[in-house]
């Protein structure tokens, strides 16, 4: 029987070589896609480096205080700023005799070049000059500065501040972010395969610098899209025979100098817990830890007392655990006050709404997500979360910003038992900040409600919430209310996927 034309075509040996390259291409694409997916999944769930994501012991502490930066307008509309965080940091640096260890996220003057009539404080140079001056005054002083690669645009620019510190003998450690888990697996899975190994150079590029003036390479942009960071803002110094620490929400970044911020200062063994957490960051970045620095905390310094304030150092995901425990543990008769720059973490949003429902007196003060260094924002995620909380009956106000940001990250639980619990530091209430993607540091304080730190925390929140003393700091919910369905959908997608700047 004669064969059909279709059969002849399928068995024609001349067509087989043409099909083989197509099959090879499909196989190569399938293998590449598999490698991409495998890389993405691994870098979301890979083990954390040693010493990351820790909760230190709850230790008795001395000299515990809440320091604040506030910006407000007076009845005539003039803007004022009252700053204490970096004033205290500079004071502590100026008295150090043995060691200074700082970990600072934004440490640059990017964004201040287009300030117009706004006068920013030159925080990046103030901190640089203070560290250099102290190193010169005390040549044997050990000084370590840990920072994020954003300050060099991921290797694409030379940082004049970091260069000045290196020339003065300061050990500068740029964090190796590739060792961390990724919040943006869709991109980072590919970047880990194709681009991480390409490195970068600071000799200039052809693309605009996304953060400031000048040009950078394509590799800077590709690294930026990983969207993770060493977001810590800490300082540990010796003070006499003891150690003192600051855990802050504030960055030494000129264009951030008008932001509202908070910091917890404490002395004693908990400062050495914070120092140990910074040693872990140096280790994951391949940096040697100076021998002059303590590597352990004396066991006898762990003291459980109900009279003195107690401090616990928290990092990364353990901050989330402490926040959830504080909210879930609040009962009728307790008060829960929250002031935060970004609020989008789903478990925490639900926990706050549930606390209000069971009779806790909840108040939430949010940044309207209106401004970012001269650029207008769309209000995501805070306005969408605010609408949800207000619908649940939670009292909520906005920081009444005028170009600056309400950059604090603070939770204050005032218990009916006469004690307060304060959690403050670098971590915004987002998936990226609380779920072991960024490096973060916060301090948890337990104190009697008449302790100085308790009075300071209550005064800070009341002043911001109630606009006392003729200072306009906050505004009613209606001013920035946003019920857009599209932006609500985008917030949910961005929070779940990591494809966002928050």
Predicted regions and their residues:
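Charged, low-complexity intrinsically disordered terminal segments
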Residues: 2-5, 15-502
């Amino acid at each position: 029987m004669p064969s059909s034309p279709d059969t002849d075509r399928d068995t024609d040996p001349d067509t087989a070589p043409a099909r083989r390259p197509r099959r090879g291409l499909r196989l190569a694409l399938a293998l590449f896609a598999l490698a991409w997916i495998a890389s993405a999944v691994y870098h979301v769930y890979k083990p954390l480096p040693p010493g990351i994501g820790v909760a230190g012991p709850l230790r008795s502490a001395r000299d515990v205080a809440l320091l604040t930066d506030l910006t407000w307008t007076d009845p005539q509309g003039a803007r004022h700023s009252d700053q204490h965080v970096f004033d205290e940091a500079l004071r502590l640096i100026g008295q150090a005799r043995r060691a200074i260890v700082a970990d600072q996220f934004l440490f640059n003057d990017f964004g201040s070049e287009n300030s117009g009539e706004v006068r920013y404080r030159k925080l990046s140079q103030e901190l640089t000059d203070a560290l250099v001056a102290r190193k010169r005054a005390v040549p044997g002083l050990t000084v370590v500065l840990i920072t994020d690669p954003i300050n060099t645009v991921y290797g694409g620019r030379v940082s004049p501040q970091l260069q000045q510190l290196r020339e003065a003998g300061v050990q500068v450690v740029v964090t190796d972010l590739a060792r961390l888990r990724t919040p943006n697996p869709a991109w980072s899975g590919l970047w880990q395969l194709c681009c991480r190994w390409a490195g970068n150079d600071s000799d200039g590029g052809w693309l605009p610098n996304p953060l400031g003036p000048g040009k950078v390479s394509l590799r800077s942009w590709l690294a930026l899209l990983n969207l993770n960071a060493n977001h810590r803002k800490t300082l540990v110094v010796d003070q006499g025979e003891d150690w003192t620490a600051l855990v802050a929400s504030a960055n030494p970044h000129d264009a951030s100098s008008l932001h509202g911020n908070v910091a917890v200062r404490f002395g004693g063994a908990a400062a050495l817990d914070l120092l140990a957490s910074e040693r872990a960051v140096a280790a994951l970045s391949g940096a040697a830890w100076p021998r002059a620095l303590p590597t352990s905390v004396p066991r006898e310094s762990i003291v459980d007392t109900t009279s003195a304030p107690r401090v616990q150092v928290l990092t990364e995901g353990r901050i989330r655990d402490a926040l959830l425990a504080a909210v879930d543990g609040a009962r009728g008769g307790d008060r829960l006050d929250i002031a935060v720059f970004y609020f989008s973490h789903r478990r925490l949003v639900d926990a706050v709404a549930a606390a209000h429902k069971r009779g806790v007196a909840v108040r939430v003060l949010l940044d309207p997500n209106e401004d970012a260094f001269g650029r207008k924002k769309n209000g995501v995620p805070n306005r969408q979360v605010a609408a949800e909380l207000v619908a649940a009956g939670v009292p909520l106000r906005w920081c009444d910003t005028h170009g600056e940001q309400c950059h604090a990250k603070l939770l204050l639980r005032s218990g009916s038992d006469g004690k307060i619990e304060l959690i403050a530091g670098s971590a915004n209430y987002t998936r990226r900040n609380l779920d072991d993607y960024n490096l973060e540091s916060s301090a948890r304080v337990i104190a009697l409600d008449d302790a100085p730190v308790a009075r300071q925390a209550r005064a800070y929140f009341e002043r911001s919430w109630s606009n006392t003393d003729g200072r306009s700091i906050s505004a009613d919910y209606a001013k920035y209310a946003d019920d857009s369905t599209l932006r609500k959908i985008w917030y949910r997608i961005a929070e779940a996927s990591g494809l966002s700047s928050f």
